[in-house]
Amino acid sequence: MSAPDDLLRVSAERLLVAIRDILAEKSIVSPAEIADRIAITEAASPAQGGGIVARAWVDPLFRQRLLGDGTRAVEELGVVMRGAPPLGVVENDGSVHHLVVCTLCSCYPRAVLGYPPFWFKSASYRARAVRDPRGLLAEWGTIVPAGVKLRIVDSTADYRWMVLPRRPEGTDGWDEERLASIVTAGDMIGVTIPKIA
């Protein structure tokens, strides 16, 4: 790291500490609540999202609840959504393929999927997802047939989105753990589709 990068990192850390101190001083949030929220975010990962997808694949009633109210459904599985924007879930099927992007910055369902992949935050991904989504997906090896509608979903500060991908053929009889193991962050963003290894 260069000296300017180090200086920027130190400045950002000082600013974060100052904001936390002010929030605690004004009794807006306690240091324990801040630590709790950080721990929750750090614990979230694409594996957690994969478990949610797997449950929806094997439990039609949960799938229905997940598509109707993503926040409430994932809370059933122990995911803490307190303080997080609402979670919307869109389903890929034979007639529509969804692709999630945050056109303004990097709004992402961190409470469910953890930190966003580096490419999700890039200006290139954000622009191409809107301008040339089929070309972008092709670079990921995802070919959306001409007859399948491609829908771009904008994740925002007010509402976060994830994709419920199609369950791959040949997974009948698989348990939730095995199903969850094949689901990646890309599948829940819509740039890839789950594949059997």
Predicted regions span which residues?
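Terminal, compositionally biased segments used for targeting/anchoring and flexible tails
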Residues: 1-197
